[in-house]
């Protein structure tokens, strides 16, 4: 796949599912560190999602903006390793790789725009063309970072995805519809969407109530809602339920589909 925009004009794009909740990291250890400590394990997860039918996969770098902002030793090597592992796996299936960037803190010492910018520019230097800013509770600093990224990589495909509760608001009290309109008005974002926090049924209701949008929509819900059993966090939601709800989400016009926490290759294959 060479041109995502052209691809989306003809059919939906299927992403992978959760990385951190599927990869069995040791308690207290950041999943991203596995890029360096267990590269074969990370590549195996990528390969399983690709075998399940994913046409796009995310780098295992969700926490990179915060790591970059804190100047965590070795964050650049972690990004490079995550990028290479995903690219190696995707090359075997002609899939596309998205540089994955989770939420950044916004402080006076380290503005969110700087954190996003550092992480995104690191991937740009590695040759990344596709970027996903995900699980955001606000748009603070995002558009500024994306504008700079657009200068560095003019033909980049850039997605911004927000974590929204079933009532349509983020945990910072921002309405998704307003965030969507701001991303559409920015002129630099290629797709906007929802991921994490909510289950497929809740996201289905949200997108069905949106009406027509100017940008392609992405929806990547959790498998269900988390329950704690014997000190383990488990997500309710069988692959069959996930597939049924995602089919209805696609029927509502959503062009980019995938999964977040609790989803597995079985959910993507379904």
Write out the residue ranges for each language-model feature:
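Domain-level signal for soluble alpha/beta catalytic cores
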Residues: 1-270
């Amino acid at each position: 796949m060479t041109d995502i925009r052209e691809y989306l004009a003809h059919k939906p794009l299927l992403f992978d599912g959760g990385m951190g909740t599927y990869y069995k990291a040791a308690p207290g250890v950041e999943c991203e560190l596995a890029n360096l400590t267990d590269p074969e394990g990370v590549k195996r997860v990528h390969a399983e999602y690709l075998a399940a039918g994913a046409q796009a996969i995310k780098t295992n770098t969700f926490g990179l903006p915060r790591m970059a902002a804190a100047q965590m030793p070795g964050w650049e090597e972690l990004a490079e390793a995550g990028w290479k592992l995903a690219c190696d796996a995707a090359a075997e299936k002609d899939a596309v790789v998205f540089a994955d960037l989770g939420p950044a803190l916004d402080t006076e010492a380290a503005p969110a725009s700087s954190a996003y910018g550092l992480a995104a520019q690191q991937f740009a230097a590695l040759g990344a063309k596709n970027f996903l800013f995900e699980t955001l509770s606000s748009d603070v600093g995002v558009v500024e970072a994306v504008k700079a990224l657009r200068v560095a990589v003019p033909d980049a495909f850039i997605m911004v995805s927000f974590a929204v509760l079933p009532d349509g608001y983020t945990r910072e009290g921002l309405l998704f519809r307003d965030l969507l309109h701001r991303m559409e008005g920015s002129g630099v974002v290629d797709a906007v969407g929802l991921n994490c926090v909510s289950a497929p049924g809740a996201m289905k209701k949200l997108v069905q109530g949106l009406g027509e949008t100017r940008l392609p929509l992405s929806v990547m819900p959790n498998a269900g809602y988390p329950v704690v059993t014997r000190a383990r966090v488990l997500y309710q939601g069988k692959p069959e339920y996930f597939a049924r709800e995602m089919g209805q989400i696609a029927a509502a016009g959503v062009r980019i589909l995938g999964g977040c926490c609790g989803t597995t290759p079985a959910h993507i294959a379904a």
